[in-house]
Amino acid sequence: PVGYRAPSWNHSPNTLTIVRKMGFLYESSLMHDDRPYELVQNGEATGLVELPVDWILDDAPLFNPRGNSYMNPRDVMQVWIDEFDKAWEEGTMFSLTMHPHVSGHRSRIVALEGLIEHITTKGGVWFGTHEQAARYVRGQAGMD
């Protein structure tokens, strides 16, 4: 692996130190920004790219049938389309957190297909892995 995402996005006081010692390229558990950025530890640049996450881009809270947050898949699709459109206008990354046991159901797959269909109508979009995104960010920021 070249990156790390903490389970449930929970960090301990030691997480960043451990991730750095492991030599990872990126970390993806923090919500400090909408744009990728370089993590700093104790005032020192780490060379580690943060690919930020956000609750609105996580399928689990939106499809939680045990809580009061369950949404219709087509409504979730529209939320994600709106989130994508603003990210596209701003020229930044759009990254969903998806769980196969959450978004892998038929009606939710239809919503995901609708989102992908919408995304592919926009110019200048590329689908990539977190590794590819982190390498792109490093190159753009002169971190290599």
Tell where the protein language model's regions lie, with residue ranges.
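C-terminal domain-boundary segment and adjacent tail
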Residues: Y26, R74-D144
